[in-house]
Amino acid sequence: MEKLLALIVVLVILLSLALFYLCNILWLRAVKIRKKLRRQGIRGPKPTFLYGNTKEIKRIRQELKLSQKQGTNNFISTLFPHFLLWRETYGPVFLYSTGAMEILQVSHPDMVKDIGRWTPSELGKPNYLKKSRKALFGGGLFTENGDEWAYQRKIIAPEFFMDKIKGMIQLIEDATVPVLEAWEDMIDDEGGCREIVVDDYLRNLSADVIARACFGSSFTKGEEIFCKLRQLQKAIARQDSFVGLSALWKYLPTKSSQEIQMLDEQVRLLILDVAKEQHHYQDSHNSLVNAIIDGAQDGRSAAEAEDFIVGNCKTIYFGGHESTAVTAIWCLMLLATHPEWQERARAEAMEVCRGRSTLDVDALRRLKIVTMVIQETLRLYPPASVMMREALTDVKLGSIEVPRGTIVQVPRLMLHLDKEAWGADADEFRPDRFANGVAAACRAAHMYVPFGHGPRTCIGQNLAMAELKVVLARLLTKFAFSPSPRYRHSPAFRLTIEPGFGLPLMVTKLP
């Protein structure tokens, strides 16, 4: 009897501790953060217990998302109408809650600038991203903080310096040829012009570039990895629609979470196979995978080394091809709907490519108009809509003391469309605003953050820009593009911003 009583006491204590822990995670910690910020004058919508403002977000989306005008580049009102409403109500800095998280949204220029001066040990990637995006990014560079982030960046970043990119341009050219040939064959069969849904072609092209440049293999060999990562992206995006208390479902053995777990394990095994096959294969184009494998051996157990390899390879596979692909897709959409800029970019590409079987770095530098088109596309359609950080210690942004545990959210779309920073034509496609560089394009350069801001600026931006320039230049010298009657302008958020119903274009072969 005494043993049973003792067991009951232990169970009651453990249950009490578990309940206190859950209460702290789901409510008390958030209340403390909210009080500290509100004492400093930070306002925001009033949250409810467990759900925070998630029910209000759903209501606002239902009421306001239909206000978007068809064809406009400013689609914030469709995807994030609550951001617009709360900014109008509370100003460029406000606080809202998703239940367990207090999110400080910052779009004030001075505070955005301040974010860039904090290190990843102080203002790093949120822990919830490491958990919710683990299947896509593992424990790689995208999600790590502190010393581990610094170590991984030191290993990987040099592989994307310009001296390495020079050697990748031919690989980009090689990956572009199959798309050019496929489109030419399709168009020839239709008498010189036909509709092509370009999305998958550009995704496969970008995936092929990453496979060739970083892993020493072709897209065909890595096709299964990219296919499963795309499935993972869609599954996680669907799961992300659960917010507030319902977000707890993603940690239960539901059909969705089981699908993600299965795909995650399949991708893991495929990546390890590719990495083992390529390791120590002495080829100048697979030095990245060797650098990752060598870096994984630094005092790690076998299991930890595998996690290191898989996490960083996932980051490069997914992050390296998806954002570049969707940018190329939006570039073609904007050029198709702005024929005057398409003609200007084509004339420049014709001049630069004339007599060249392969472009080089000097040729890419001469593509001034093409570069402006890419920069303007990244302004209007940044692949990642928000930049997320977590205060890992107490930090100060402007005059605001931000307590540890606060999620700091920077809405890229709102920065890029801010009329005070960009002028009254901020919603319009005007590549010439970048004619004299980013500094002259807007009043504050830190209001343009397609590749991030501060020490966590994307390491792959040199490769992305080189790839986009080569692909656009080659496509423009071969084809003319115009909108298909079937195109429906409906940007969708699926971890990246992409056309909701694909991008069908009328493609004409040039003489």
From Swiss-Prot:
Q: List the disulfide bonds.
A: none
Please name one Pfam family that this protein belongs to. p450
The record's principal subcellular location, in a coarse class, is: membrane
Q: What is its EC number?
A: 1.14.-.-
What is any one of the record's Gene Ontology cellular component terms? membrane
Q: Which residues cross the membrane?
A: 7-27
Annotated GO biological processes are: lipid metabolic process
The record's comment on protein family reads:
Belongs to the cytochrome P450 family.
**Protein name listed in UniProt:** Cytochrome P450 714C3
Upper lineage is: Eukaryota, Viridiplantae, Streptophyta, Embryophyta, Tracheophyta
